């Protein structure tokens, strides 16, 4: 019997290997997600604060907000890399 996960892994196309362009896409997606999250998250400052200087506004951007935006950025980046690799651009 074949494992279903093994069959799905074999059916998926090969993805792009690590390169400078993949790293740049991931960094840009994370910065984009950070900017979106900074303005979209309404209730900030509920968790631990970061040991970094805050932006000029009175909004505190803590560790939970950073983890949320970076997780979203990695999801966006993985989707961008997979989409660009499958279309042949990357």
Curated annotation (Swiss-Prot):
Family annotation (SUPFAM superfamilies): Photosystem I reaction center subunit X, PsaK
> What does the UniProt entry say about where the protein is found?
Cellular thylakoid membrane
**Pfam families per record:** PSI_PSAK
Record-annotated membrane-spanning stretches: 20-42, 67-89
The record's keywords, sorted A to Z, are: Membrane, Photosynthesis, Photosystem I, Thylakoid, Transmembrane, Transmembrane helix
Q: Hey, which family's this protein in?
A: Belongs to the PsaG/PsaK family.
Show the HAMAP family listed in the entry.
Answer: PSI_PsaK
The protein's matches in InterPro entries, at most eight in alphabetical order, are given as: PSI_centre_PsaK_sf, PSI_PsaG/PsaK, PSI_PsaK, PSI_PsaK_bact
Any single Gene Ontology cellular-component annotation: plasma membrane-derived thylakoid membrane
The UniProt entry lists membrane topology as: Multi-pass membrane protein
Reply yes or no: does the keyword Thylakoid apply: yes
- What name does this protein carry? Photosystem I reaction center subunit PsaK 2
Q: Name one GO biological process term.
A: photosynthesis
């Amino acid at each position: 019997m074949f494992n279903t996960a093994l069959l799905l892994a074999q059916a998926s196309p090969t993805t792009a290997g690590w390169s400078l362009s993949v790293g740049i896409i991931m960094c840009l997606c994370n910065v984009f997600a950070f900017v979106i999250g900074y303005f979209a998250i309404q209730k900030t400052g509920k968790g631990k604060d970061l040991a970094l200087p805050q932006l000029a506004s009175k909004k505190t951007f803590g560790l939970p907000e950073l983890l949320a935006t970076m997780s979203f950025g990695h999801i966006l980046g993985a989707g961008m890399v997979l989409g660009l690799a499958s279309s042949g651009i990357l």
